[in-house]
Amino acid sequence: LGKLKYNAYPADQYLEKTEILPFNDRQDQREGIKAVERAIAQGSDRCLLAMATGTGKTRLATGLMYRLLESNRFQRVLFLVDRSSLGTQAFKAFESEVINQSQTLAQIYTISDLGIEYDTDIDVQVATVQSLVHRLFNSDDPLPIDYFDCIIIDEAHRGYTLDKEMTEGEDSIRDEAQYLSTYKRVLEYFDATLIGLTATPALHTTEIFGNP
């Protein structure tokens, strides 16, 4: 797999000039999408977007992924969660919410559900931190560092929190200090732009992503 790198200027110009779809009808969602796009165009590879609970972070992420992929700004996006239930919830939203011309994100792009199987033909991979730990650090076939060129981290402030609903293989991370260290290892493994979504930025969150 070659590096997912190219001249980003045309994509940045496209995003600047293209209106956000009515799917993201809330002003805070539209402003958040534009803020992330501006930061990326200005060369930032780490962005933190703080949004109050209930303002539609998953809906914002859906609209943002659509624009970033449609513009060819990024080629393969990882949607990273810290627990399986959040990943399942997000995947169902990608499958069911109509975003453009009567189509859902999952109908427009190839999206892979939770799991440790990774296909080079996918556009969006939904995964937990724990499943990536297994694939990157406990596997004979780790992913290349350029496998993803964009990572969107849902509930980024919870990166240190132990998952009380861990599935098989996820309980190998025993304490919060170890989890935070592993969480940072996963994020720093890939040569990718990081976009963190959070309602309440914690100290470790701003240390990783910078201020919102």
Question: Model-predicted segments: where are they?
Answer:
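Conserved motor-coupling elements within RecA-like helicase/translocase cores
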Residues: 110-125, 142
